[in-house]
């Protein structure tokens, strides 16, 4: 922890956070590329909605398995930075291979490989932040690392740039474009970021409110709720990314340019929420932020189903309904890391991120795609409404973990006892 190591200056901590955020931004840029390019890919490869869902789900499956494995390995063995650099180079190569895919099965294979490469990147990044960033800024740092770059690059820049590039040069060249910058960021990380081998913080004493032993940690109620919320949030995210571009073009009859800018509005919203809401949670608490944003998740599917106005009004609906993305780093990283023994943070993060990908990322698009084949493209929006309802029910039971909020509560309690 940086409090014991004076060389981990505030400047280095924010430089570390910015680099990890940029790296994960290109992860989501590559991951989401197929979703935004699907209107171009579908006719050439002859895909139905179930196959579209399968392409999204297969990546989530191997992503989840990698998150489980890397989180555990990073807690017990080896160099976190080395694992991060190798994974980053591998996912860039997989993106390039996606542009060469001649069929559904070939594309399926490249997406499976990409999931293996990408799945461990965020657990590794959050482990580095947990070990090297001051706990007073942990929420916003984890939020920026997970949400800022991924939202800016994966949800805003990706649809605008990739759709424009595919329109001009073809979707295959758009995949080649997606691979290049990730290699540059991986090289910078290799030379700039300091390593935190094994469980560097294993000798640290856990805070008083953190539970002990490994299995007790993973059975801790906050971790269970965070796994459930992670599953629901990833389900909402992946189903929206997978089917909203098709809904906008096939049902609302927007052209490719309008669709790309509307999907880009999600990126702008998530970029802002990644630091505004996580930073706010450092001050007012994690629980209230997660609960309120879960409630606002109703706005996007309901507003889209009822929409009959100009595109800019739908962009406003997207902006409000996407607030839950600001809570994703909290339930997938910050709250779990503050709820378990410091030696088991990697395993807890792997459980949240891996579990969310298997159930939220693998099964959700498959079921939603099959539902859409039988009912129509509005079916995934009904799915989102159900997910929002379940998220609200789970979020209200979270236990507060924000250090500043707990410290204020302890101070108030001491004052009350003296009186």
What are these regions (language model features)?
Residues 2-10, 196-227, 415-419:
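Juxtamembrane intracellular "pre-TM" segments in multi-pass secondary transporters
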Residues 34-35, 222-271:
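Extracytoplasmic gate region of multi-pass secondary transporters
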Residues 46, 78, 100-106, 253, ...:
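Helix-breaking motifs and short loop linkers at transmembrane-helix boundaries and internal kinks
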Residues 57-72, 264-276:
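Central cavity-lining transmembrane alpha-helices of secondary-active solute carriers
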Residues 65-102, 281-287:
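Conserved MFS/SLC helix-loop-helix module at the cytosolic interface between two early adjacent transmembrane helices
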Residues 110-150:
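Cytoplasmic helix-loop-helix junction between adjacent transmembrane helices
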Residues 145, 149-191:
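Helix-loop-helix hairpin linking two adjacent transmembrane segments in secondary transporters
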Residues 287-332:
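C-terminal transmembrane helical hairpin of 12-TM major facilitator-type secondary transporters
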